[in-house]
Amino acid sequence: MSAVRIGQYTLRNNLILAPMAGVTDQPFRTLCQRLGAGMVVSEMVSSDMSLWNSRKSSLRRIHEGDPEPRSVQIAGGDAQMMAAAAKANVEAGAQIIDINMGCPAKKVCNKAAGSALLRDEALVSEILHAVVSAVDVPVTLKIRTGWDRANKNGLNVAKIAEQAGIQALAVHGRTRADLYTGEAEYDTIGAIKQAVSIPVFANGDITSPEKARAVLETTGVDGLLIGRAAQGRPWIFREIEHYLRTGEHLPAPQLDEVERILLEHLAALHAFYGDVMGVRIARKHVGWYLATRPGGKEFRARFNALEDTQAQCANVRAFFSERRQSLETEDGQGVAA
């Protein structure tokens, strides 16, 4: 894998944790970077700075100790507000500004932001030029292939982005209308890569080392954005990086390591958000970690009723202890047979 540069920053590999609202908070970003991500991107931050005073918004902003280069994603539909938000985030420590024109959520699109912007190429150009002019750090862009299948203008938007001075482009291989259904359009991503000279990253359905290599080979992109596949599996980055580098699979993490990672993640969530909010946010992450494990579904129902940090950690330890005992019993029966 050749090194990928975004402006003055050389990434340690070409695998990026995709920004996901409600998921890629500081604890998760830090964990994914430690487990192999070449770069991580913050949760989406509104360009409406009047909303930044809420506790929720302040937690979404960049923090000391965030992995570098610190990339912050902003969203909005007004060029001057976007420029001001970019400037404020850079003053707060952001080293890269990422512009969201890919989010398909109704509450974002209804405000003429996210992927709704793809319907107005003139506004796209205005926003990109305004943000690039406002800051002296690299500006990147995330898009979809278009608004719907009858209006797939990702190629045009990519060219507009390059002309505006965007330093790298991430493309989710679906239209806004597709949401997350159907197959990702890797052919469209490949065409976009061929049309511009800036680094292009593919996003969508990259769930395994083999899929990662196939997408890189078929599209010719410079790197990959991995989002949903990292939920409950933050070690996917080191698995893909190792496979791309050596052609061999890393062994899956042992039960003890999964337990250590999950407990580390819980402790970070509790410390970052405080006990009440931390307990609440931890529930979905634990659900993702244990979704495919025997007894995970039943455990999640019990775990979601827990109301304090110590009980959460104790119950996770008990779950893994029971799993180890179960595996030892199964191994013993296998030997006896």
Curated annotation (Swiss-Prot):
Its cofactor is FMN. The keyword NADP applies. It comes from the Bacteria. FMN binds at residues 19-21, 73, 142, 203-205, 227-228. It catalyses: a 5,6-dihydrouridine in tRNA + NAD(+) = a uridine in tRNA + NADH + H(+); a 5,6-dihydrouridine in tRNA + NADP(+) = a uridine in tRNA + NADPH + H(+). The active site is at residue 103. Its EC number is 1.3.1.-. The keyword RNA-binding applies. Catalyzes the synthesis of 5,6-dihydrouridine (D), a modified base found in the D-loop of most tRNAs, via the reduction of the C5-C6 double bond in target uridines. Belongs to the Dus family. DusB subfamily. NCBIfam families: nifR3_yhdG. This is tRNA-dihydrouridine synthase B. It comes from Pseudomonas putida (strain ATCC 47054 / DSM 6125 / CFBP 8728 / NCIMB 11950 / KT2440).
